[in-house]
């Protein structure tokens, strides 16, 4: 249907709508995660996300459209799962650091005596560097990095639901994971860390 030649100012008289009214009031919605906007006749409606923190367990979408929390038991299960995911994320970061330390560039210095001028003996030092881009440690680090990035974005999206229970699960899981896994870690700041 071509709407290019239509006069939209005359439409409001026939459709009962006044588009020039500045005092439009919308009826309050009952749940902060779902608010249907006006439909354009195609049956599709837009879901509004909350912009403030709320504590509820009904109709909470968790990452995927088919994963909806509607009961206190489902929220408790989601809390535990998100808590464990955040803990796993912290453990994965520490594990990657340990693997990186073990597989870092191995530099060996070999000293050999060589004859010098006037019959003196000099020590010549050779440096051998061993690290390749297509090595197993580097490929493993790459796969683990991809997993870490995906998990970090999942945790960010979970936090962005603004559901208080799920936000607490992310923060508590990350804190517990850090407490459990990084107590032996040297104080190093990772500037490439995602979502913190």
Curated annotation (Swiss-Prot):
Domain of life of the native organism: Eukaryota
Tissue expression summary: Expressed in the tubules in the inner cortex and inner medulla of the kidney, the villi of the small intestine, the choroid plexus of the brain, the stroma of the ovary, the seminiferous tubules of the testes, and the sclera of the eye. Expressed in intestinal epithelial cells, with an increase expression from the crypt to the tip of the villus. Mainly expressed in both proximal and distal tubular cells in kidneys.
Modified residues (Cysteine sulfenic acid (-SOH)): 195
Catalytic activity: Cu(+)(out) = Cu(+)(in); Ag(+)(out) = Ag(+)(in)
Effects seen without this gene: Homozygous mice lacking Slc31a1 exhibit profound growth and developmental defects and die in utero in mid-gestation. Homozygous embryos exhibit a dramatic reduction in size at E7.5, which is exacerbated during the progression of in utero development through day E10.5. Although the fundamental mouse embryonic structures are conserved at E7.5, homozygous embryos show that many structures including the neural ectoderm and mesoderm cell layers are poorly developed.
Extracellular topological domain residue ranges: 1-74, 160-162
Keywords: Cell membrane, Copper, Copper transport, Disulfide bond, Endosome, Glycoprotein, Ion transport, Membrane, Oxidation, Phosphoprotein, Transmembrane, Transmembrane helix, Transport
Record carries keyword Mitochondrion: no
Biological process (GO), any one: protein complex oligomerization
Oligomer status and interactors: Homotrimer; is stabilized by cisplatin via interactions between cisplatin and the Met motif, and could be crucial for the copper(2+) reduction process and copper(1+) stabilization. Heterotrimer between SLC31A1, CCS and SOD1; this heterotrimer is copper(1+)-mediated and its maintenance is regulated through SOD1 activation. Interacts with KDR; this interaction is induced upon VEGFA stimulation leading to SLC31A1 and KDR subsequent co-internalization to early endosomes, thereby activating KDR downstream signaling in endothelial cells.
Name the UniProt record assigns to this protein: High affinity copper uptake protein 1
The organism of origin for this protein: Mus musculus (Mouse)
